[in-house]
From Swiss-Prot:
Belongs to the TRAFAC class translation factor GTPase superfamily. Classic translation factor GTPase family. LepA subfamily. This is Elongation factor 4. Required for accurate and efficient protein synthesis under certain stress conditions. May act as a fidelity factor of the translation reaction, by catalyzing a one-codon backward translocation of tRNAs on improperly translocated ribosomes. Back-translocation proceeds from a post-translocation (POST) complex to a pre-translocation (PRE) complex, thus giving elongation factor G a second chance to translocate the tRNAs correctly. Binds to ribosomes in a GTP-dependent manner. Its EC number is 3.6.5.n1. Gene3D superfamilies: 3.30.70.240, Elongation factor 4, C-terminal domain, Elongation Factor G (Translational Gtpase), domain 3, P-loop containing nucleotide triphosphate hydrolases, Translation factors. SMART domains: EFG_C. It catalyses: GTP + H2O = GDP + phosphate + H(+). One of its GO terms (molecular function) is GTPase activity. HAMAP family: LepA. It is a peripheral membrane protein. Residues 2-184 form the tr-type G domain. One of its GO terms (biological process) is positive regulation of translation.
Length: 597
């Protein structure tokens, strides 16, 4: 066991985490040069294109060190994005060490810090590495200073390397072997194995990626999943080099995969503990929690006959993504669709993109909302994730909204504009600290403000230099109201939004004005109104198209003209009673693009 090293790589997006992983795999001969490709651990197309890692992957490598010993290195690739922070914490708790990769030309950024703190809390040994030192603008001294200031770990002996050219990668592995402790654990104790990740394979069912903490796991063992108490028979165990290679057993300290004929992903939850039926472990490994969606949106097929296809696509996606939730929903305006729950905005974008790419779906997405807690007058508390389900205001005692703590990092010249943005978004400043040229701001901001367009606005006010991460803090009472949009005094449920009262007038006016541009003129007047409860706060009219009925009167008596105009008016009135206004697709997208001033 002294020769095993379990480690993962922590980095901000684009600091070269996947490239470094590629180099380490190549150096240890995990794949032949022919099989080697860029970002070998990012298996989804969308991961490669966006340059992000979504699912955790592993590679078991053997490396002959300079001291002549052969070490088994288990690389556990973690997602870097805040939406997947639970996956990150599970991957890190399976390791004893982590390589902290910092881009020498950019210094420390938000997600590096967030994941690094997670690692330190879990007691993982952090080994700093400076990447991209081959770039002309690299400034290693400044980067070292930032690591020490912001994260507070000693970085004087940080290993410089360039994952692109391969220079210094061997030093990185040597530093890793020297600094990271070998795993502790007893191969003869009752089995405890942590599920780091799980995904669905069409041939064998669910494949679980596990880190064996104590005990030994062999094929034909009867195992128990401790979170939900289900029992399964192990069919195969093995390791990834990233290719899968079967093994006879996985012992304490090793990382590998387990196939046990599980049919659905819900059974194998990330963070759960596996133990054997013969000798049960006394307690599960700590840290397991159910992942709860934070952001909800409605997904509707453009063509009504695509509903079943959408359900199938969502079910297939859920096979590989246990944190995706969905339930059927009916909207008067959009027909049948699904209310989906996501971990965060990036997760939502990825799911939408995968539906459109892998399953050829055409989708309409409603505005993303967060989960509100509503205290009713009769003392009950309900959760509302869909504005259309918000109860009648007269029955509501108080509405609580989720507040998140946001950490922002940016060069100091952008501080002013970022603070202005946070204040607009109803943020309250908690902390501000300077680290060299970088500034760290901590704010508490309502989550509802973040899901709308905070990230895009942050990037535009800081010219792309600011980076952020956020975590849920608590629910707080807030004066939020539901703004309904009425078209010819009919509510359009898909257009309702929940906003803060201070912003509701403006929001209502903006949406009504936007709808007026988008809804085509009809044969009769269309009234667009924004309402809070029974109070109308804004109104716009779309004027009717009308024929010039007086064209045939040459001069003549006024009563004749009046008669024709009255007749036209009566006809329009009749049409308005029976006519329905078709709301074009763009209208639903327009709601997402209303700027908050």
């Amino acid at each position: 066991m002294d020769h095993i090293r379990n480690f993962s790589i922590i980095a901000h997006i684009d600091h070269g985490k996947s490239t470094l992983a590629d180099r380490i795999i190549q150096l240890c001969g995990g794949l032949s040069d022919r099989e080697m490709e860029a970002q070998v651990l990012d298996s989804m197309d969308i991961e490669k294109e966006r340059g992000i890692t979504i699912k955790a992957q592993t590679a078991a490598l053997s490396y002959k060190a300079r001291d002549g010993k052969v070490y088994n290195l288990n690389l556990i690739d973690t997602p870097g994005h805040v939406d997947f922070s639970y996956e990150v914490s599970r991957s890190l708790s399976a390791c004893e060490g982590a390589l902290l990769v910092v881009d020498a030309s950019q210094g420390v950024e938000a997600q590096t810090v967030a994941n690094c703190y997670t690692a330190i809390e879990l007691g993982v040994e952090v080994v700093p590495v400076l990447n991209k030192i081959d770039l002309p603008q690299a400034d290693p001294d400044n980067a070292i200073q930032e690591i020490e200031d912001v994260i507070g770990i000693d970085a004087q002996d940080a290993t410089p390397c360039s994952a692109k050219t391969g220079q210094g990668v061997q030093d990185v592995i040597e530093a890793l072997i020297a600094k990271v402790p070998p795993p502790e654990g007893d191969a003869d104790a009752p089995l405890q194995a942590l599920i780091i990740d799980s995904w669905f394979d069409n041939y064998v069912g669910v494949v679980m990626l596990v880190r064996v903490v104590n005990g030994t796991l062999r094929p034909k063992d009867k195992v128990l999943l401790m979170a939900n108490g289900s029992q399964h028979l192990v069919e195969q165990v093995g390791v990834f080099t990233p290719k899968s290679i079967p093994r006879d057993a996985l012992t304490a300290g090793q990382v590998g995969f387990v196939i046990a004929g599980i049919k659905e992903l819900k059974a194998a939850k990330v963070g759960d503990t596996i133990t054997t039926m013969q000798r049960k472990a006394e307690a599960p490994l700590p840290g397991f929690k159910e992942v709860k969606p934070q952001v909800f949106a409605g997904l509707y097929p453009v063509e009504a006959n695509q509903y079943e296809a959408l359900r199938e696509s969502l079910e297939k996606l859920r096979l590989n993504d246990a944190s995706l939730m969905f339930e059927p929903e009916v909207s008067q305006a959009l027909g049948f669709g699904f209310r989906c729950g996501f971990l965060g905005l990036l997760h939502m974008e990825i799911v939408q993109e995968r539906l459109e790419r892998e399953f050829d779906m055409d989708l309409i997405t409603t505005a993303p909302t967060v989960v509100y807690q509503v205290e009713m007058r009769d003392g009950t508390v309900i959760t509302v994730e869909n504005p259309a389900k918000m109860p009648d205001p007269s029955k509501i005692e108080a509405i609580l909204e989720p507040i998140v703590t946001v950490n922002l990092y940016m060069p100091q010249e952008y501080v002013g504009s970022v603070i202005t943005l946070c204040t607009q978004k109803r943020g309250s400043q908690i902390n501000m600290s300077y680290h060299g040229k970088q500034v760290q701001l901590t704010y508490e901001i309502p989550m509802a403000e973040i899901v709308m367009d905070f990230f895009d606005r942050l990037k535009s006010v800081s010219r792309g230099y600011a980076s952020m991460d956020y975590e849920f803090k608590e629910y707080r009472p807030s004066d939020v109201v539901k703004v309904d949009i009425l078209i010819n005094s009919d509510k359009v449920d898909a257009l309702s939004v929940i906003v803060h009262r201070s912003n509701s007038q403006y929001r209502g006016r903006e949406v009504a004005a936007k709808m007026r541009e988008i809804i085509p003129r009809q044969m009769y007047d269309v009234a667009i109104q924004a309402a809070i409860g029974a109070n109308i706060i804004a109104r716009e009219n779309v004027k009717a198209l009308r024929k010039n009925v007086l064209a045939k009167c040459y001069g003549g008596d006024i009563t004749r003209k009046k008669k024709l105009l009255e007749k036209q008016k009566a006809g329009k009135k009749r049409m308005k009673q029976v006519g329905t206004v078709e709301i074009p697709q763009e209208a639903f997208l327009a709601i997402l693009q209303v700027d908050d001033k």
